[in-house]
């Protein structure tokens, strides 16, 4: 009888577990990142790719960098121009790109002063042509918060980032291209083996400011 009673007790307890779990309050949703005032800051960055394993045509490198900029949330209208191209078509030994792109940056007093000073040089030309005041445009502020952008290679065969892009991503980090554009690399794991493609070679995370949509 004692053994039977213990079994019933265990069964009753197990049956109650789903009810107890359901009664537990749900974990609170994580707080959104703090909102800051931001401005668009345009920067120009030159980059030359030096391959050992994966080779790109000039168009291929340009398109890959364009995709990265879109992932980072660069302001529409950015440009990526090919540099140092010799081959009309096919892989290049050391293709390069010139990037002109704007990403949000926190609107500190120092940055606003710098942007206003740079834009003031264009004021006379803007007035003569009836264009908007460049100082007002350059210092226009908007709310933004930090967004984490993750890059992971080879998730599917159709992924934009493949394991063969390992050297490219590694060189972009090493050359501080992300930093020069106004992004922050917070996690960088690349396993690039010369003349060999490694599965799962790229796992990176980059933080950028993202405009907060108007309510």
Predicted regions mapped to residue ranges:
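Glycine-rich, aromatic-bearing surface loops/beta-hairpins
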Residues: 152-163, 167-215
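Extracytoplasmic/secreted envelope proteins and their assembly/folding machinery
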Residues: 58, 62, 66-69, 170, ...
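Bacterial N-terminal signal peptides that target proteins for export
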Residues: 1-13
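Acidic helix-start/capping segments at beta-turn-to-alpha-helix junctions
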Residues: 77-102, 190-197
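Boundary at the C-terminal end of the N-terminal hydrophobic targeting segment
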Residues: 21-25
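Sec/Tat-exported extracytoplasmic proteins
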Residues: 68-76, 176-181
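Acidic/histidine-rich, surface-exposed loop or edge segments in extracytoplasmic proteins
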Residues: 36-53, 141-160
């Amino acid at each position: 009888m004692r053994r039977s009673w213990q079994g019933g007790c265990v069964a009753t307890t197990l049956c109650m577990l789903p009810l107890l779990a359901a009664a537990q309050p749900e974990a609170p949703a994580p707080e959104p990142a703090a909102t800051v005032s931001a401005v668009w800051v345009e920067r120009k960055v030159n980059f030359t790719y030096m391959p050992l394993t994966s080779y790109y045509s000039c168009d291929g490198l340009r398109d890959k960098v364009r995709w990265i900029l879109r992932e980072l949330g660069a302001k529409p209208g950015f440009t990526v121009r090919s540099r140092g191209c010799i081959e009309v078509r096919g892989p290049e030994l050391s293709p390069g790109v010139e990037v002109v792109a704007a990403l949000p940056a926190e609107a500190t007093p120092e940055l606003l002063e710098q942007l206003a000073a740079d834009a003031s040089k264009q004021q006379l030309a803007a007035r003569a042509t009836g264009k908007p005041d460049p100082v007002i445009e350059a210092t226009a502020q908007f709310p933004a918060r930090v967004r984490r952008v993750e890059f992971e290679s080879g998730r599917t065969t159709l992924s934009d980032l493949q394991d063969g892009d390992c050297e490219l991503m590694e060189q972009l980090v090493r050359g501080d291209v992300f930093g020069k554009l106004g992004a922050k690399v917070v996690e960088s794991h690349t396993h690039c083996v010369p003349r060999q493609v490694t599965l799962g070679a790229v796992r990176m995370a980059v933080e950028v400011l993202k405009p907060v949509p108007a309510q």
